[in-house]
Amino acid sequence: MTDNLGFQADREAQPADSVQTYPKPAGGAPDFPALELEVLDYWARDDTFRASIARRDGAEEYVFYDGPPFANGLPHYGHLLTGYVKDIVPRYRTMRGNKVERRFGWDTHGLPAELEVERQLGITDKSQIDDMGIAAFNDACRESVLRYTDEWRAYVTRQARWVDFDHDYKTLDLPYMESVIWAFKQLWDKGLAYEGYRVLPYCWRDETPLSNHELRMDDDVYPSRQDPALTVGFKVVGGELDGAHLLIWTTTPWTLPSNLAVAVHPEVTYVQVRSGDRRFVLAQPRLAAYARELGPEPEILGSYRGAELLGTRYLPPFPYFMDNPNAFRVLAGEFVTTEDGTGIVHLAPAYGEDDMAVADAAGIAPVTPVDSNGRFDAAVPDYQGLNVFDANPQIIWDLKNGSGAAAANAPVLLRHETYEHPYPHCWRCRNPLIYRAVSSWFVAVTRFRDRMVELNQQITWYPEHVKDGQFGKWLAGARDWSISRNRYWGTPIPVWKSDDPAYPRIDVYGSLDELERDFGVRPDNLHRPYIDELTRPNPDDPSGRSTMRRIPDVLDVWFDSGSMPYAQVHYPFENRDWFETHYPGDFIVEYIGQTRGWFYTLHVLATALFDRPAFKTCVAHGIVLGSDGQKMSKSLRNYPDVSEVFDRDGSDAMRWFLMASPILRGGNLIVTEQGIRDGVRQVLLPFWNAYSFLALYAPKIGTWRTDSPQVLDRYILAKLAELRDDLTREMDACDISRACEQLRQFTEALTNWYVRRSRSRFWSEDADAIDTLHTVLEVTARLAAPLLPSVTELVWRGLTGGRSVHLTDWPRSGELPADPGLVAAMDQVREVCSAASSLRKAKKLRVRLPLPKLTVAVENPQHLAPFVDLIADELNVKSVELTDAIDTYGTFELTVNARVAGPRLGKDVQAAIKAVKAGEGVVNADGTLTAGPAVLRPEEYSSRLVAADPEFTAALPNGAGLVVLDGTVTPELEAEGWAKDRIRELQELRKSTGLDVSDRISVVMSVPAGRAEWARTHRDLIAGEILATRFEFGEPADPVAIGDGVRVSISKV
């Protein structure tokens, strides 16, 4: 009968007057997924999560912000990764004494939701939404974003993440939205929100502009794309260059009908060249690039500085806007380069930021013949109705053949080629974007950009380089943020305008109270179309005919999520005191792309509204990649079902795989089944087996104590004390991957050294060993609890019978005895044994074959002297010699790190390399290296210990010394090795026949004649190791064949 945590016996069921024993795990390999489900069931019945928070009532709060995911699909590994970190840090902080509320959030607005509904309803055009009605469409959006909430809850719970779903926040909730419009009103009142006409990235499929930061979140926003690249000549009229053609280069032929000017760099040299019966003007540095068309040495008719060309007039390639004042002349542009193209840039002010800026300065009004769907309108009749990208071939045809409107001004198509380049695409619908001048509302980020840079210095980033790298550089170049979207499902921009320009007025609202005051009704839904229905007479119109109407735009969804810290608690309308004493938050985590997304918008709004950072510590992890090496994405569906991984390997295994990887240091990670299973092999299974070993061999429950005099006990306790300090340091710094590595190394020392070397003590029921392992496992379970919450719960409850390891405190500093000298010495012993074992394996000298001698050459051999017998026993050698004569067995090979040293040393680095190669480098006492004329710092060179005889010599890690194995095998050693092989086989036979480890046995052995002498010589050794009180040579009854022709029978005495 199993109890609720998979054990065969429940401690509470044991009679009070009986000897209390550990609950014993079920036999066979542990089924971690099944055990985890039992833990989850126990937590649910026990309400352990709420208890963990309640026990910290009154304690200092640690504020964690849960970045809201879009819930319009099921979670993938990227969500799991972030979720694990969101679980680990709060668990750790709770154990350290903080109260950590964990409130789940849902990001519900914006294009992701709208596009999903459009897909479900077969909508392909915004006009279809208007036809069905905004109310019906938004109702469908509301239903869609909440459709998967139950599945999300199941997945998050299955990953053993503790988070409060019952008090979650949703960005669509009225209180949340009220806080968002409050934030907008605050920006307006501060003069930091304004309406402007700018060139912005624009999605013609979704008919809305995007903000610049949305184009920089992920690399896949800029996939490679092939576009036509044209070199076109515009004919000059008047002046010295009359009749010549100004050569421009463009990868957007569709913008040529909107050409209003060209730009040159004032300081670049331009030339007029003759080619056949035509003359062309281009930048002199670009002549060679056009040798095919212009000839290798074209006749140069004149040379001009760019400044001399300013004001030159020309005919545009298409005549649609010939009456535009001040247009069709050469302007100055500092952005013009000669790295590609012709050095002359065609300007279509409505479709380029630089174009707009230069044209504005020249008094040229932009023209916008492309409508909101990305199609040419009636102003360009030849291409009317065509999408701009579909129009490209027709435009090229007309330019090439002088047909259509291109015939009017005689442009010359000099070159038509295909150009492959990264091109921005909509991050949701995946269509190529265009740049288009639109009216939009902006946050004036440039007004407080420098302050954002300053406040960033108060944030602790992990990895650290993000602060002044990816995030800091982005802040330094931040531009005003376009926050309006011409869409439906989102928080409304709370701006009402007069519908009569003769009586202009703008009203901005920041609360339900303000809306009720002016409109006489208190909204119970701030979404469209209901908010749009609030109108009132314009107070500034004495005629009483004009009306105040809300502008139709909604806010960028990133404004919603960036408002999360205050909007989730309905600040400032509720919880004012709490928010103002708990802001900024202590910790957030998301993937690195959020430096342009959530991290950025949090920082923008926090700086503008509160002049403070939004968060104190931020983990920006790398990207989990799918099987195709691309970022995992719901839309690409390039990842296996998460539930399959949980069912096969378990959540702790997945957690370990992700948390121990380089992804938390900013690297990327491809999920593999083998990687997940390695987590089971490296940590989960060894830790579980250590508990199982204790439960199996301990006659009663151990006592928590740390006073054993035995050296191995003292070592593992001191090693554990170091682990406690290491994990505390790493977890305080949110360096979770480093914490995992520290735990892995300790688990290796615990199971593959301490337990293995102490087995005989457990078999003999040594109280020191049992109590020490009990203590070590109890403390380790607490230390590992945030990282492996399920398996540690099982082990800790098995050890203690307590309610939950997650209701305990983090081990205190000084709780365990420290002994750094012993730890250093024993760790070096382990390194010696590991290196020598590798030599054995390489030479195919089996472990049970004794060898004559091991020589250990280290700097301070006296530190290893107390452990000579241990080394000899571990390695099965007859003697161990310690020496400090390292140079007898190897030499240190020095290498100059030219890449590091070069910038500082200049040409002296080559002299240093030459001196080192000649053996003239000298390592100084302070760690520097004198080589020729240079003194190199420790990071500017490396030192590697190289064995003189690599066949039987191996170096210790970090150049600490060498081990030399004597591989001579004598007949006597071969005989002893033969006996030890039989001992192993007999031990296996004991186990397979069901004998207890302490049972004494009788043995009858038949040995081939050629091995009889070996068997007689080592009879006592064999008998002693297998607990045989009677041992005879002869013909056994019912014999069992073991190795090398030996047959035996055994029986319990």
UniProtKB/Swiss-Prot annotation:
It is found in: Cytoplasm. CDD domains: Anticodon_Ia_Ile_ABEc, IleRS_core. Gene3D superfamilies: HUPs, Isoleucyl-tRNA Synthetase, Domain 1, Valyl/Leucyl/Isoleucyl-tRNA synthetase, editing domain. It catalyses: tRNA(Ile) + L-isoleucine + ATP = L-isoleucyl-tRNA(Ile) + AMP + diphosphate. IleRS has two distinct active sites: one for aminoacylation and one for editing. The misactivated valine is translocated from the active site to the editing site, which sterically excludes the correctly activated isoleucine. The single editing site contains two valyl binding pockets, one specific for each substrate (Val-AMP or Val-tRNA(Ile)). Its cofactor is Zn(2+). This is Isoleucine--tRNA ligase. Pfam families: Anticodon_1, DUF5915, tRNA-synt_1. Its main location: cytoplasm. A motif ('HIGH' region) lies at residues 69-79. The lineage of its organism: Bacteria, Bacillati, Actinomycetota, Actinomycetes, Mycobacteriales.
